[in-house]
C-alpha cells in the first residue's frame, strides 16, 4: 500500500509538470505564430504588426519610418523619434530607425546632426532608400554633382522602386552641361540600370535636344543606344521641328552618312526598329511589304491586293536646296502604265515636289530614273514609294533591289 501511494504521488507530480510544459509550449507557439504573422504584415499593416510584436526592433523601426513621412506633423515626428530610439535599443542595426532620426533632424534644421546620423546609417547599410534620397539632396545642396550621382547609382542598383522615382528627377537635370557630363561618366561605367535609363530618357526626356547631346556624348564613349531608343529620340526631335539636332544625333549613330544622299540604297541595314531617317514600311492593312536580306544584298518586296493603293515604303530626308536624281532597279513589276507604282518626294507639310514612275521591269532591264527639285522653303522631305489601285486579279506586285537619291553630279 505505501508503494502504491508513493507511485500515485509521483504520477500526480509528473502530470502537473507535463501540464506546465504543455502550457509553456503552447504559449511559446502562440508567440512564435504571432511574431511570424507580424513580420509577414510589417509592410502592409505596420501598426498591426507592431501591436503583435512590439519587441521586434525591425518592425518598430518601420513604424517610425511611416510616422516620419513627408506629411508628418510635429507630433508625428516626436512619436517617430521615440519609436526610432526604442527600435535601436531593441536592434542596434535597424537602419530605418536611424534614417528616421536623420530625416527628423534635417526637418528641424539640424543639418550637421543629420549628416552624422546618416553617416552611421550608411555604415550599417548602403541599401536604405531614404538614406540615399537624403544623401542625393544633401549633395545637390552642396553643389556636389559627382556625389549626387554616386548616390543615384547606389539607389538605382539597390532599390527596385528607385527607377520609377529617380529617373524623372534625373532626366530633368540633363539640360545642365555639368550634370550631363557627369552623367555620361557614370553611364560609361555601364551600371546595371544604364540601358533602362537610356530607353526611358529617349522617349520621356523633357528636352529632346539635351537628350540628343547626352546620347552623342555616350556614342563618343562607345556606349551605343538600342535601335528603339535611337528611333524614339529621332522621332521626338523631328516632331518638335528640331531637324538639325535629329540629323546630328542620327549621324553620330551612323558615322559617314551624308544628308544629300538617301540611305541604305540596297536594303542591307536589316533594322528591327528603324528611325525616320531609315527605310520604314508604311503599308495599310492588307498590303504585304517586307525588306529581306539575301546573299547579294537586300530587297524590298511588295504585294498589293486589287483595288487597293497607298504608301508602301518611306524615308525622311534633310536635303539642301537643289536638283536631285532618283535612280534604282525593279524586279517583277508588270502593270498597265496607268497603275504602275511611283516614287514621290514631298515636303514636310505635304507639298509634292514631283514623281518618278517605276516602269515595267521588262523595260530598260528594270532601271528607273527621274529628277526632283528641292526649293529653299522645303527644309525636310519624305521620299515615298506609292502603289496605285488596279483591277488586275493579281493586284500590284514587285520588288525593288536598289534605289538611290543623290544630287546631280554626285
Which residues are covered by each model-predicted region?
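Structural marker of alpha-solenoid helical repeat scaffolds
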Residues: 52, 90, 124, 158-159, ...
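Extracellular and organelle-lumenal recognition/adhesion modules and their flexible linkers in secreted
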Residues: 5, 14-43, 161, 184, ...
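Canonical positions in the second alpha-helix
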Residues: 49, 86-87, 120-121, 155, ...
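TPR alpha-solenoid repeat register
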Residues: 59, 97, 131, 165-166, ...
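Structural register within alpha-helical repeat arrays
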Residues: 62-68, 100-101, 134-135, 166-170, ...
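Structural signature of tandem alpha-helical TPR/SEL1-like repeats
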Residues: 38-46, 71-83, 108-117, 143-147, ...
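Residue at a conserved register position within TPR or TPR-like alpha-solenoid repeats
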Residues: 67, 105, 139, 173-174, ...
Amino acid at each position: 500500500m505505501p508503494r502504491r501511494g508513493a507511485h500515485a504521488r509521483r504520477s500526480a507530480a509528473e502530470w502537473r509538470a507535463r501540464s506546465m510544459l504543455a502550457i509553456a509550449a503552447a504559449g511559446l507557439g502562440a508567440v512564435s505564430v504571432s511574431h511570424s504573422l507580424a513580420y509577414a504584415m510589417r509592410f502592409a499593416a505596420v501598426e498591426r504588426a507592431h501591436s503583435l510584436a512590439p519587441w521586434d526592433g525591425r518592425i518598430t523601426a518601420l513604424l517610425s519610418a511611416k510616422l516620419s513621412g513627408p506629411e508628418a506633423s510635429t507630433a508625428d515626428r516626436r512619436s517617430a523619434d521615440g519609436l526610432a530610439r526604442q527600435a535601436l535599443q531593441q536592434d542596434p542595426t535597424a537602419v530605418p530607425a536611424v534614417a528616421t532620426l536623420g530625416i527628423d533632424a534635417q526637418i528641424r534644421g539640424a543639418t550637421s546632426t543629420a549628416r552624422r546620423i546618416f553617416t552611421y546609417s550608411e555604415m550599417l547599410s548602403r541599401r536604405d532608400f531614404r538614406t540615399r534620397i537624403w544623401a542625393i539632396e544633401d549633395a545637390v545642396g552642396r553643389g556636389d554633382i559627382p556625389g549626387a550621382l554616386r548616390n543615384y547609382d547606389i539607389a538605382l542598383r539597390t532599390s527596385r522602386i528607385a527607377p520609377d522615382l529617380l529617373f524623372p528627377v534625373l532626366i530633368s537635370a540633363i539640360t545642365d552641361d555639368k550634370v550631363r557630363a557627369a552623367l555620361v561618366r557614370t553611364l560609361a561605367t555601364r551600371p546595371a540600370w544604364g540601358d533602362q535609363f537610356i530607353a526611358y530618357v529617349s522617349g520621356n526626356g523633357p528636352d529632346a535636344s539635351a537628350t540628343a547631346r547626352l546620347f552623342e556624348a555616350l556614342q563618343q564613349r562607345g556606349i551605343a543606344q538600342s535601335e528603339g531608343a535611337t528611333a524614339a529620340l529621332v522621332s521626338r526631335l523631328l516632331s518638335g521641328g528640331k531637324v538639325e539636332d535629329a540629323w546630328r544625333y542620327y549621324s553620330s549613330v551612323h558615322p559617314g552618312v551624308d544628308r544629300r544622299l538617301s540611305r541604305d540604297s540596297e536594303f542591307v541595314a536589316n533594322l528591327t526598329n528603324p528611325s525616320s531617317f531609315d527605310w520604314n514600311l508604311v503599308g495599310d492593312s492588307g498590303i504585304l511589304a517586307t525588306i529581306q536580306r539575301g546573299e547579294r544584298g537586300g530587297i524590298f518586296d511588295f504585294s498589293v491586293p486589287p483595288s487597293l493603293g497607298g504608301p508602301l515604303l518611306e524615308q525622311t530626308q534633310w536635303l539642301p536646296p537643289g536638283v536631285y536624281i532618283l535612280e534604282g532597279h525593279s524586279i517583277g513589276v508588270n502593270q498597265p502604265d496607268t497603275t504602275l507604282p511611283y516614287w514621290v518626294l514631298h515636303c514636310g507639310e505635304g507639298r509634292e515636289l514631283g514623281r518618278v514612275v517605276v516602269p515595267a521591269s521588262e523595260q530598260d532591264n528594270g532601271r528607273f530614273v527621274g529628277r526632283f527639285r528641292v526649293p529653299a522653303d522645303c527644309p525636310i522631305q519624305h521620299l515615298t514609294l506609292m502603289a496605285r489601285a488596279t483591277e488586275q486579279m493579281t493586284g500590284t506586285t514587285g520588288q525593288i533591289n536598289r534605289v538611290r537619291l543623290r544630287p546631280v553630279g554626285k
